[in-house]
Amino acid sequence: AELSALEEHLARCRDRVEGLITPLRSSEREDILSPLYESERLLRSAERAISRAERATR
């Protein structure tokens, strides 16, 4: 249950980061977009890792 809750929290965080990215996509703000894209990728990677750990406990 704890891993599932953590995975859901990471998904919500990723959604929030995506929400920050969306309005900036048409801008020239690579100084902001680049770290946001990196954060999005890292959160997605963390989600997958937690998901694998959760499956391993079954």
Model-found features: residue ranges?
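N-terminal acidic leader/helix
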Residues: 1-22
